[in-house]
Amino acid sequence: MGVLGVLLGVLAFLEGSHTRHWDSTSCHLVQPIPGNPLGSLSFLGKDAQGLALFQAFWDTHHRLQVCIRQDESELITAFRALCAHEPLQHSFIQTPGPALQRALATLQSQWEACQRSQDSPTGAREKRAIEQSGAPDREHRRRRRGWTIPGTLWCGVGNSAENASELGVFHGPDLCCREHDQCPQTISPLQYNYGIRNFRFHTISHCDCDARFQQCLRSQGDSISDIMGVAFFNVLEIPCFVLKEQEACVAWNWWGGCRAYGSTPLAHLRPRTYYNASWKAEATSYTPSPQSPAPSKHPQKRGPQQTQARRHSTTTTTPFQTPAISSRPDMIPRGQPGVPHLGFQDGPKHQSAHRVCRSLRHLDQCEHQIKPQETKFHLLNSAQMPLFHCDCTRRLARFLRLHSPPAGTDKVWDLLGTTCFKLAPQLDCAEGKGCSRDHRAIKVSARHLQRLHKSRLHFRDKGTGGALAQPVEPPGSTMSFYSQCLQVTQAIWRRRGQKKFWSS
């Protein structure tokens, strides 16, 4: 499926081919791909029509694939806020080096041809062929199933993740996009489902999924999440749908007449919900840097991210920056599974928090669990959260005794409750009836969960628990325990440690 990204989904709104010549550029965001150090480039540019947000994407053979110009004021404001005010502003290049200047000049000369190829039927057919190709010589295309927003692996058309647990640099919005991608009720572009055909070029989802997506983006409290929200809900104006049981034809005769009627869920479209961005519209002067700037005489102070990177790499400069600011990282490193980005670190405490969240992933993958309102093993789980086998919760409690829960995640542990279930053979199963292996679940009070609950209260009373940084998903949510824990801890470290980290 794939959440339609802010800068990629707007392809439907691209205007006709006009010559674009930006006079000045700033806020350059570069991301490499395997085989190409310049896989994507995003920047603010000023042309004859005013300030705009430009995006370009190349393949591993350095061929320009996609080029986008977007001049919605909300998107420009969000991108500018991300560049100027966020702790991750060091990922942006303000003064391009020689290599980046050459890339900008080449892009400028190819811009019109790139847009013509996108608008032509031949170009559309080539893109579809690329997406559907599975030949061995196109392995890099299978690995990158769609274009994503720089710094994310799930926000865009398709995703670029190697596995389901991998997240990009912008962990928060990427987590939201990944959860939205897993919505069980969707209608793909130009497909028929739930009694209606989606004539749009974007997937539409159930309204509950869109509501959770918007809530997740709001809870991040950063500009890249606002960019996603503004694009998806305000610019693209993608509707959602609700399902209602109605009488409809459930079986058709071969000549087209209805053979049988029955109750079936049918989709009813609802208008999109407006996204209110959370960034502060501060009155700041904006002066784009010239495309061919003079080298600065005042090198910036080396940040701790680069200091850390030097311990593992012999590379000291990059070709996309001027020597004056070569100490600043110019490319967003790709997120690795299980390894948090430096921007979210706060020493060993963060690593411990990440390990604890990973322990919840094992709980989510527990083989024996009963989902909310589900009857399994002859037991109805009437609660609004999953009920797990006692072996799974006992393993979690044993781990948490060695690794204290992350500060601020109280509500996540509250959702676990203090009960679990055991499996026992049925007592009234007579021999020869084929039910000797049929077990029934017995709900019991878990002493190990009660001890965990008391321990959590003890830490909170001592003041080490901290305040909850953001609301977790409401009971009954489909978001996993691991995702909720990761979402909370990332918000905590972002608010408490990022500014100190990047300013040191």
From Swiss-Prot:
It is an enzyme of class 3 (hydrolase). The keyword Cytoplasm applies. One of its GO terms (cellular component) is centriole. Ca(2+) binds at W154, G156, G158, D181. Residues 146-287 are annotated as: Phospholipase A2-like. It comes from the Eukaryota. Disulfide bonds join C155-C177, C176-C216, C183-C209, C207-C240. This is Group 3 secretory phospholipase A2.
